[in-house]
């Protein structure tokens, strides 16, 4: 019996260790309340209109009735965060066990630890500014879709699930199309190349992407609520919950245009965001640099131009992040999603045995064996950063900027 339990612990060591680590972080660091700016999405449902962000409230009301207690919503968020921790851990363990080569296994383990220690680990979703964000459910969906891709063999069932879950996720928040949809595009691109450009596969992949794009466009431009007066909407919502609702998100989402968002939220702070954004990118070079290095190895090792093109197109899926960085001011959320998707892409392609990524992981594993201290320092370095917030920048980024500014002033004698 003891031997059997020991074998199970050894087999599922990654899942167990990652789950315990994440759940422990959730236990000791979770914010005490749902962030005020997002709590309204737990109350709004389809009785108020039709469109994105109304799905979550509708689902909750199926179980709670017409009145939602604040404590109920908070417990729901905690439960979903716990599920996310388990899903990420299971995904990591699946990939680790699939690696048979020792170097690839070591590289996969490094990427898992590297991600869990990074500012974009699931722990960013229970910081004060992100507690209860709809990004939680988008992340859960992205992990589930990755698992479906890895485990479901039937092509038609797989893409039906992609379409249904993708549309459901967009109904939770249409920003999915910019934040996590790139990971789904990478999977469809891999399928197209893997099929040898079979017409049926191309049609299925493109149709899925097109239909999800149509769902997004409808949710973004053709949906809305049945209220023309903000005060009436707030009064009606407040009568159905004990949550102290925040008015600004309702006004911004349903009574502003995209132009209003840009000029009222983004433009006044754009210079500061660009400044701190550049510093964030610079300080987190070890993270994105590691992923980019693997992609470059995959491109270099491509046996022909067609193989190289696949990886270039996969990299270009990241262009989807440009609109949200340009138009919306929650740069912490955008950075977090970007790094999450890079991690998911590596895990999925490693699991399915993509040749280029496999060669990149093998080289990474060999590099880790030659210089383990360097990679340990990388992990310790990224672990020194706090987790991404919503609007605010990483504390270390701001300190770096002001310390550098003070140093410059001291050198110049000002």
Give the location of each predicted region.
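Membrane-lumen/periplasm interface segments of specific transmembrane helices
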Residues: 24-33, 201-291
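Short hydrophobic alpha-helices at membrane interfaces in multi-pass membrane enzymes
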Residues: 151-167, 197-204
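Perimembrane helix-loop-helix junctions
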Residues: 180-209
């Amino acid at each position: 019996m003891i031997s059997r339990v020991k074998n199970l612990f050894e087999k599922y060591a990654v899942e167990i260790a990652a789950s315990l680590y994440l759940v422990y972080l959730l236990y000791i660091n979770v914010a005490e309340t749902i962030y005020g700016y997002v709590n309204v999405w737990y109350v709004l449902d389809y009785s108020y209109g039709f469109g994105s962000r109304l799905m979550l409230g509708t689902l909750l009301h199926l179980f709670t009735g017409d009145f939602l207690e604040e404590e109920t919503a908070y417990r729901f968020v905690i439960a979903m965060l716990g599920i996310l921790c388990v899903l990420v851990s299971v995904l990591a363990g699946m990939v680790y066990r699939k690696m048979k080569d020792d170097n690839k296994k070591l590289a996969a383990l490094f990427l898992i630890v590297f991600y869990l220690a990074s500012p974009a680990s699931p722990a960013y979703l229970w910081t004060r500014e992100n507690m209860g964000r709809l990004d939680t459910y988008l992340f859960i969906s992205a992990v589930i879709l990755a698992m479906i891709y890895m485990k479901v063999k039937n092509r038609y069932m797989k893409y039906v699930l992609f379409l249904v879950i993708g549309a459901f996720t967009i109904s939770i928040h249409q920003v999915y199309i910019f934040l996590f949809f790139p990971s789904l595009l990478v999977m469809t691109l891999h399928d197209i190349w893997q099929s040898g450009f079979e017409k049926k596969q191309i049609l299925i992949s493109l149709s899925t992407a097109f239909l999800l794009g149509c769902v997004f466009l409808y949710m973004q431009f053709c949906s809305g609520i049945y209220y023309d007066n903000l005060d009436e909407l707030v009064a009606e919502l407040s009568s159905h919950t004990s949550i102290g609702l925040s008015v600004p998100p309702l006004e911004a989402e349903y009574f502003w245009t995209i132009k209003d968002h840009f000029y009222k939220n983004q433009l006044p702070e754009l210079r500061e965001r660009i400044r701190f954004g550049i510093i964030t990118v610079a300080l987190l070079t070890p993270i994105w640099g590691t992923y980019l290095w693997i992609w470059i190895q995959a491109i270099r090792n491509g046996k022909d131009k067609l193989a190289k093109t696949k990886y270039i197109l996969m990299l270009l899926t990241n262009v989807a992040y440009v609109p949200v960085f340009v138009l919306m001011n929650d740069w912490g959320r955008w950075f977090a999603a970007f790094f999450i998707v890079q991690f998911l892409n590596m895990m999925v392609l490693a699991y399915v045995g993509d040749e280029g990524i496999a060669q990149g992981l093998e080289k990474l594993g060999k590099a880790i064996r030659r210089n383990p201290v360097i990679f340990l320092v990388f992990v310790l370095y990224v672990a020194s950063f706090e987790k991404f917030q919503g609007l605010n920048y990483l504390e270390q980024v701001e300190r770096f900027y002001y310390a550098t500014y003070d140093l410059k002033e001291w050198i110049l004698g000002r």
